[in-house]
Amino acid sequence: MKILLEELPHQEESLKAILENFTGIDNAANDSDVDYVYANPLIRGRYNEISNIDVKMETGTGKTYVYTRLMYEMHQQYGIFKFVIVVPSPAIKEGAKNFIQSDYAKQHFSQFYENVRIELNVINAGDFKSKSGRRNFPAQLLNFVEGSRQNSNTIEVLLINADMLRSKSMRNNDYDQTLIGGTTSPIEAIQDTRPVVIIDEPHRFPRDKANYQSIEAIKPQVIIRFGATFPEVTTGKGSNKITKKDYYRKKPQFDLNAIESFNNGLVKGIDIYYPNLTEEQAKNRYVVDSVKAKELVLKQNSKSWILHVGDNLAEVDSGFEGDIEYAGSKMLSNELELEKGMTLIPGTYRSTYQELIIKDAIDKHFEIEQANFLRANQRENNVPRIKTLSLFFIDSITSYRQDDGWLKATFERLLKEKLSRLVAEYEFKRLPREKEYLEFLRATQSSLASDNQNVHAGYFGEDRGSGDESIQAEVDDILKNKEKLLSFKDENGNWQTRRFLFSKWTLREGWDNPNVFVIAKLRTSGSDNSKIQEVGRGLRLPVDETGHRIQQDEWPTRLAFLIGYDEKDFAQKLIGEINSDAKLQLNEEKLTEDMIQLIVTKRKKVNPEFTDERLLEHLDNLGIINRKNEFKESIDIGGVQKSGFEWLVELYPELNTNRLREGKVIDTKKHSIKVRVKLRKENWEKVKELWQQFSNRYMLEFQRIPETISFMAEQIVGNHSLYEREVPMQMKESLHASDDNESVVLREQENEYQRIYLPGMAYGKFVKRINIATGIPIKEIHANLFKLMKSSLKGDARYLSELSLNNIIREFKKRFDEIFAQAYEYKKLDFQARTAIYNPEMDSFVDDINAEVIGVNIDEQAQEDNRYLYELPPMRYDSVTPERDLLRHGYNDKVTVFGKLPRRAIQVPKYTGGSTTPDFIYMIEKDNDSSVYVLVETKAENMRLEDQRIIDIQKKFFDTLKEHHIEFIEATSAQQVYSIIRKLSEE
């Protein structure tokens, strides 16, 4: 298989934000080295902190993709070709290297940047070792420094970790070699390239520490930081002490935080599991009373125990199994970092308890694996399978690597037992996909029983440089052969059964595999560790066996995270950490001005007349707030008691965008929030006739408009008014203190140069980019552009600018919509396919569906109505107006079925690509024993052009199904829907 990288909207938005905030090239520079071919062009505002850029992206959302594409984009737009990527550790360096050098990444980027390649130069420990008595520079450093801009198709990238960058090898200047520019110092040589620096994981590079200072030493013109977290700075003391994130421009230029990532389905949901202890075991706990480099003091009630380096914790309590010792330097031998006040529970160290976690992890793995493998499980036309991987974090390498190691023996015993039960179950299954799964299980059994099993593998820090070929093969599979791990079969058709991985913390950073669905922690990580980072290896959305990335609305996925009882508050801490990342912190005591503005801004999109006065009046009338806008403690509305803040969030769920939605992270021991909603089958059966039609596949047949493409090419590519020469800007910069004297701001004034224009693109490149963006054949583009260049443009290649390109693309999209918006019809094909809720092969509806494809907000107070499409409560909806209003309404008896449709329930094809589904369905019984089906698409009054297109598309499609008594309506308010339903009921 090959992983297929796709352009995701949030990644495109990130790239756009970076380029919008980039200061551009300084075409007015008087520097004598401005045209130095071994260095980047001079950047406006270079070496100035305010020109630097911060990009905040949550773990698992693709920051490596973004900064890799950014390098291609800056090379294409600005001619910048020398980048230094600085990472905090060798593990992250390996991860970045694997992505940039992967075939799938190169193939993906080649479609946008033809004939351009990244020359990745990686500096590793040992590269500076002298050979034959001579101290030479590493070849990778030479390649980077001596790369010339005259090689216009190559981007030179130096990838280095922090320790290496600040090492003596980089600072020394006594090498037996002189680089271009006359220097013998690696640091000075990099300085001469005038690099753009990309920092990965900026929280590991606080600006007052050595790691960051080593970056400043190479004198980057601009620094761009990418990370989920950023370093903090503290000012003041005592009650005046303030700690805040240290951003270059006081806030990130792109901010995709944890809340948005989870709420918008950009990462997996999380389920937290842990086996319970007996009451006696749970109460038996020891507190770290003090911990020093050579001494640990544990306390239980009034009794204390002093342990020195090398002392075994079993001397304190036999429950501490596994030869756990105090290793010194505030760490146990299992690498658990200790701090005063920590609690240690011996029961969680017992082998029987560890075995429980392993058993639960295996059970959870196969529960998820069966769902991912079978998926639709039809007789034919099955969707691609998804490989399921599990990751175990363990204490001891010997317990896994040794043939008789306890962990390995226990895991294999439990796995064999589980496989035997599953094989016995699937021997009686008959569907094709079920038979395939039986083959997969039997292949797993065979491999596990062989001398060289290929079912599980481990990677540990101690494995680096191991001479054991079998271990090295395991390590290579885990670190480098991502596509092999994600594949079900090799090129010879043999099953790839490896899917259980073991590590200490070596795989905690830098490594990722999107198909990790289970993480089991057989070791505690300590209280200071980032909880998001711990689950981070399993957050990425998975890919199927074709390499396609699976979005949450297509196939909802969750990470099963198994921990010990001693971390049972993990879910609460994780939710707290996610919510602390909110752009706006919700005040549960008082309605703040920021909260008011958030509600008003979002409501205005639906109702332009909504104001802050209207909001406050509504809350005041309900008694939710007092005259100081403080929330009242307990309010009774409709017989339900809640705090003022709780009522505010229910009435105005727009605020939920600033906190993690319920069900995204679940502690399975405490909560049973429904992540799936059961269908009321009896109601869906009443509308089955419709879905028998909706499951038919349709193709779009465009009208053959004579010479359309030639006409568009002539009207757009041949339109001289769309061509502009780009004028360089002269930027005058001056530094000024801010009004509060706490910061320095850069004030800029741009002036156009008179009669000076920037050079344009190469002719072939300009033609190719139009072709990629519009689909107009190259032959047509060339014919019209060549003619225009000879006539109106007088052969002036400066007109082949980015401005001209953007004008052409914008005009093409406008003309395409004008010509083809109604110039097509739907043609029914002779086959059917599943929708999100209906299986035509079985002629039946699914039992349940992912709750969030119905709606992201929850109404626990919804009244039971046996005509509704789903079991209640809770009721799911997306917007208060009109969605929640429509769902809460008491309809007349003629309405026999109603409800909100899940996404992809119908899948009306769009001429712009993709599909769309209306929001609501109503079934109305008439007096003459006939029925009418009302499909409703709800939109805001001030709808966007794209929303209007969707309405037009749906109307056109449903008009072809009029014979099935379908009425399609668009509505901007609940009253419109009530009125139409009332009218249809009376006819």
UniProtKB/Swiss-Prot annotation:
Protein name: Type III restriction-modification enzyme BceSI Res subunit
Coiled coil: none
Keyword ATP-binding carried by entry: yes
VRR-NUC domain location: 886-974
Enzymatic class: hydrolase
UniProt organism field: Bacillus cereus (strain ATCC 10987 / NRS 248)
PANTHER family for the chain: ATP-DEPENDENT HELICASE IRC3-RELATED, TYPE I RESTRICTION ENZYME ECOKI R PROTEIN
EC number: 3.1.21.5
Statement: the UniProt record of this protein carries the keyword Hydrolase: yes
Keyword terms of this UniProt record: ATP-binding, DNA-binding, Endonuclease, Helicase, Hydrolase, Nuclease, Nucleotide-binding, Restriction system, S-adenosyl-L-methionine
